[in-house]
Swiss-Prot record:
Residues 100-110 are annotated as: Flexible loop. Binds 2 divalent ions per subunit. CDD domains: S-AdoMet_synt. The lineage of its organism: Bacteria, Bacillati, Cyanobacteriota, Cyanophyceae, Nostocales. K(+) binds at residue 44. This is S-adenosylmethionine synthase. ATP binds at residues 16, 175-177, 251-252, 260, 266-267, 283, 287.
Length: 420
């Protein structure tokens, strides 16, 4: 008997208050790593009406102006008019930073494996920056090997920002949210149930002043300029049964930090798989690569994506866990949800033998300390909005499928050996 169900994921634009914070945090990280690739960074940002607070722990040789970094990023996002209650030029910026705790630093600088002389391997020298669990996921629903709902939500959010920035819909303002509900049948997406867009806008549009008329124009414009282009090249599209909701409160004039405070790390589901896969709870933005919340989550995605890209499973989830100050993962778990072409234990063995999952190894494999300087001073800030994963518009090392062919051959060899 077939099972039909709905699954929903959301995204937000770069002008959402929480995303402003994520982008400032990651711009700080980019700037510090560009000058000093060994910087230890845990940059947290809070925004509210007319206020930016930069706090956290940073140890670095770099010399930067944190207030200028924040203002430049705020202006780039689109907050340039003080009449909106928040702008790059008018906001106050408070900087309250400490250095990384020496108790934490000693475990990261010299991992337990090295301190206790259990290993002389290079990648055993750096310990994990904290304990924790991280998940990586991939599935074959989209070319990005990501779940369809989060891909669509991101596409709409990016298009929403694009038509604002180009002036195509000049009445739009930076804050916005999107949400897509996908119809599934027997585990495969078959339709679009609901598309929801909430977008900040001016109180009037040209000579249109009536609130209902303003909302009617916004709804029509968003369908034509945003939704239709997003779905234009896709097989699954909205149909006559699809609900299209726009600003369901009736208006969205007060937005950005004037409407809601923002905080770094508060959109972790938007940053990953839209709720389709499990999440360990750790945020990404503002954290240097020794923080396994970030680097190990990228590594787990890399593992899962290569397994799916190799055709060894239709979907794959990988869990990694770490202890602070210890280089090697405490545990590695893999689940293909019954879609694997071979037993999960065979895949797990291949992962353990062929993927480098120690923090120093992940940093080296993905070049995580040097990418900001190699890419003109910006890398992490570009993934701080519209998702860290499945970004075919960016060259991200954890999105590469360079181990897929090897995995296919290894499985074939393993099966042949078992038969022999």
């Amino acid at each position: 008997m077939s099972r039909r169900y709905l699954f929903t994921s959301e995204s937000v634009t770069e002008g959402h208050p929480d995303k402003i914070c994520d982008q400032i945090s990651d711009t700080i990280l980019d700037t510090l790593l560009t000058q000093d690739p060994t910087s230890r960074v845990a940059a947290e940002v809070v925004v509210n009406t007319g206020l930016v607070l930069i706090t956290g722990e940073i140890t670095t040789k770099a010399n930067v102006n944190y207030a200028n970094i924040a203002r430049q990023k705020i202006a780039e996002i689109g907050y340039t008019n003080a009449d909106n209650g928040f702008s790059a030029s008018s906001t106050s910026v408070i900087v309250a930073l400490d250095e990384q705790s020496p108790d934490i630093a000693q475990g990261v600088n010299t991992a337990q494996e090295t301190r206790e002389q259990d290993s002389e391997e290079l990648f055993d020298k750096i310990g994990a920056g904290d304990q924790g669990i991280m998940f990586g996921f991939a599935c074959n629903e989209t070319p990005e090997l990501m779940p369809l709902p989060i891909c669509l939500a991101h596409r709409i959010a990016r298009r929403l920002a694009a038509v604002r920035k180009t002036g195509e819909l000049s009445y739009l303002r930076p804050d916005g949210k999107t949400q897509v509900t996908v119809v599934y049948e027997d585990g495969r997406p078959v339709g679009i149930d609901t598309v929801l867009i909430s977008t900040q806008h001016t109180a009037t549009i040209g000579d249109i002043t009536d609130e209902a008329a303003v909302q009617a124009k916004i709804k029509q414009d968003l369908w034509t300029a945003v939704v239709e282009p997003v779905f234009g090249d896709l097989e699954i599209k909205p149909d006559q049964e699809t609900r299209f909701l726009v600003n369901p409160t009736g208006k969205f004039v007060i937005g950005g930090p004037q409407g809601d405070s923002g905080l770094t790390g508060r959109k972790i589901i938007v940053d990953t798989y839209g709720g389709y896969s499990r999440h360990g709870g750790g945020a990404f933005s503002g954290k240097d690569p020794t923080k396994v919340d970030r680097s190990a989550a990228y590594a787990a995605r890399y593992v899962a994506k290569n397994i799916v890209a190799a055709g060894l499973a239709e979907k794959c989830e990988v869990q990694l866990s770490y202890a602070i100050g210890v280089a090697r993962p405490v545990s590695i778990f893999l689940d293909t949800f019954g879609t694997g072409k071979v037993d999960d234990e065979i895949l797990l063995g291949l992962v353990k033998d062929n993927f480098e999952l120690r923090p120093a190894g992940i940093i080296h494999s993905f070049n995580l300390r040097n990418l900001p300087s190699e890419r003109g001073g910006r890398f992490y800030q570009d993934v701080a909005a519209y998702g860290h994963l499945g970004r075919n518009d960016l060259d991200l090392p954890w999105e590469r499928t360079d181990k897929a062919d090897f995995l296919k051959q290894a499985v074939t060899h393993s099966l042949s050996a078992a038969i022999a």
